Amino acid sequence: MALTPGAVGAAHATATTATTQAPPLRGSVATPLPAAPALPGPALRSTPALAMAASAATSPLDLAAVKQAVELIGKGRVDEATNIESTISDPLARKLVEWLVLRSDNSSADFSRYAAFIAANPSWPSIVTLRRRAEAALWQGRADPSTVLAFFNGDPPRTAKGRFALARALLSQGDSARAQEAVSDAWRGDAFSGDLEAQARTAFSGLIDTADDKARMDARLYAEDDDAGISAARHLDDTELAIARARVAVINRERNAKALLEAVPAAGQRDPGYIFSRAQWLRHSDKIAEAARWMQMAPHDPAALRDVDQWWVERRLLARKLLDLGDSKLAYAIASGAAAPNNENYRADQQFTAGWIALRFLHQPAVALPHFAHIADGASDPITLARAYYWQGRAAEAAGHERDARGYYETAARYPTAYYGQLARARLGLDEVTLRTPPEPRADLRGLELARVFDILYAIDARDVVVAMAGDIADKANDLAALVTLAEIARSHDDARATLRIGKKALGRGFPLELYAFPDFGIPNVEPIGPQVERHVIYAIVRQESEFNSRVVSGANAYGLMQVTAATDRDTAKRFNVAFDQRRLLNDVAYNVQIGSAELGNDISNWRGSYILDFVAYNAGPRRAKEWIEQYGDPRDPKVDPIDWIERIPLQETRYYVQRVIENMQVYRVRFDNSPKLWIESDLRRGS
């Protein structure tokens, strides 16, 4: 059933350089095959909430005022920005500054300002954030009960402060039952500071019972919020406090964790939270079989587990450790025995992991198939759906049901921008990646209120604000023409970040915005200082590493477009005889790309051309790449299945990263080569 394209030719190994300016959108992509099935998308609205009347063009004076307000807000001087707002004559520019003020962490606006903006602008970005701020203002400003009850009429609170404000209002009207319910919901489900906890204990002392404190203790410890967990435990008995202290020791990997676990009274050792931490400590201690035994003692009732998402994360780590030890049967039991997670991605991951173990390690396709089918439950994004149908195809194929397998592969192949959609196409012998063409931008929609907001922000070079708006808009808007208009504005300003943000979010919801989701601009032309790397590889990396943000600094202190660390910069600069200057990693985009692409090219050579190992090393370091070769075999070995090898990568982040970069490469080849040729199987085998 499989059909492998020929090996990548010599011409494919020649580097090209990128362009800085956004090229014309048309003509840069192959026309979709007539037989290619349409990707289902969300229902579209003909008259979107985005299409609101806009005022005339903003004057230079108003633009200067908006620019000054943005700068002041960035410095935390929000009240001064509010003063400037009152001097702006353009209503839309004034509204934009008000939105920026209300959205700021340093805003001192009262509830009435938040409520007025939310009521007048329900389709604006960040309304959920503004509503959360409004709830805080209700609590902190001790708003009168009628105001509080009116605000929450038909729209319940989202935050602890909102729930506490509602409870206070209900108590004032004698409704203690509903007040207790609001307090209990906050106590059991919300994260909040110690100061707010003290305020709430004083205000609602008669409404918080031991069950609330026990639930809070568990919830905060699953979230690894040590202080809040211990604080709640201090209102419980000695056994619960002992459990909490033992769990904190496990979370922090303290040397006395074992002693504290063993000191918990026998009755407390049946507590689900204790079982979780005991299994976690055993896994940390490489006592995997014993950890699995404890894990299997856990209850299956989600209510007893409290945090089914964290239980799944622990089970996933444990199941993979069991696979490493060769105990596939127990690994399957651990994975399949998990309570269904609440998080959509975790639910899909749990079903995939159980199905993958059943199919590829236990060789039981009939057991695997229903797991793979459940991956798609409630999913809408191409990556998840393609994975669901591809693996159903693999299970059906393994069971000898070729007709069913073909049907599953054909469904997966509807998602050609997704890794498993691309693999499904290769499995079917479809050697092309087809991208849908969005509708032409409509000039009449340039009058959209938010389109004009984009114009204002670009006029004052406030691109970070555009990016923040873009993601929220694309998450919620259902008007395709409006989304194309906003994406085209971003593209016309050479803003790869905002173009990507709109395209990527919208593509994940089924809209045909592939050409915006994979910008073919945003990386400057550079003279390579090391081995040349193809343009589609560099773009694939940048899209995943930084999403074209040249100023981003990661938690690991990686800098800029290609997320280069100072150590890499120093080593690469020395290797290729270039002056080392760490400051340039953020201040000089071309330098960042030179260093990053040189590192990438050097590593590709070191790994004999293997993209898989190069991308693993780029994300997780060469040491881990070598460790995983030792543990799982060499993906360059023809006897090793590269698809399974990638799925065996222990780090979730790196596993996801490699798949995303490989899928990005397939799309960027289409964009840059103007050819729909699919190379994914050759890419996975590169270096063999």
Question: Where are these predicted regions, by residue range?
Answer:
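Compositionally biased, proline/threonine/alanine/serine-rich low-complexity intrinsically disordered stretches
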Residues: 2-62
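TPR repeat positional signature
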Residues: 65, 93-94, 98-101, 114, ...
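Structural motif corresponding to the intra-repeat A-B loop/turn of tetratricopeptide repeats
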Residues: 75, 104, 108, 141-142, ...
